[in-house]
Amino acid sequence: GTTFRTSIAENALVGSYAVVNNKGCMVHPKTPAQDMDEIASLLQVPVVAGTINRGNAAIGSGLVVNDWAAFCGLNTTATEITVVERIFQLRRDLGGGRANLLQQLRDTLVDELA
């Protein structure tokens, strides 16, 4: 496998200052644009700088995300949630309302657990 050594906003603990899924990446708000471009190029996903939990720069301490859901701290603001939903592409028009959403979630879980 390939190993990439990097830092995020001059912090070596990249797991605390970045959260990534296969759709996007969110990093420490003081990450230089050049570093964000390098990360985007390495991972082949869009990268955005931001905070979580009402201004916390340690993104990894307050956000867990996968391909279809994100869990964040209770103090996370609406603006922060909007950024999370957009960069990780979590809001999709599923059509058919709540019943269809629940069915799709059930189908996904059953597929993964089968």
Curated annotation (Swiss-Prot):
SMART domains: eIF6. GO terms for molecular function: ribosome binding; translation initiation factor activity. Keywords: Cytoplasm, Initiation factor, Nucleus, Protein biosynthesis, Ribosome biogenesis. The keyword Acyltransferase does not apply. It comes from the Eukaryota. Its main location: cytoplasm. InterPro entries: eIF6 (IPR002769). One of its GO terms (cellular component) is cytoplasm. It is found in: Cytoplasm; Nucleus, Nucleolus. Pfam families: eIF-6. GO terms for biological process: cytosolic ribosome assembly. Transmembrane segments: none annotated. Monomer. Associates with the 60S ribosomal subunit. Binds to the 60S ribosomal subunit and prevents its association with the 40S ribosomal subunit to form the 80S initiation complex in the cytoplasm. May also be involved in ribosome biogenesis. Belongs to the eIF-6 family. This is Eukaryotic translation initiation factor 6. It comes from Trypanosoma cruzi.
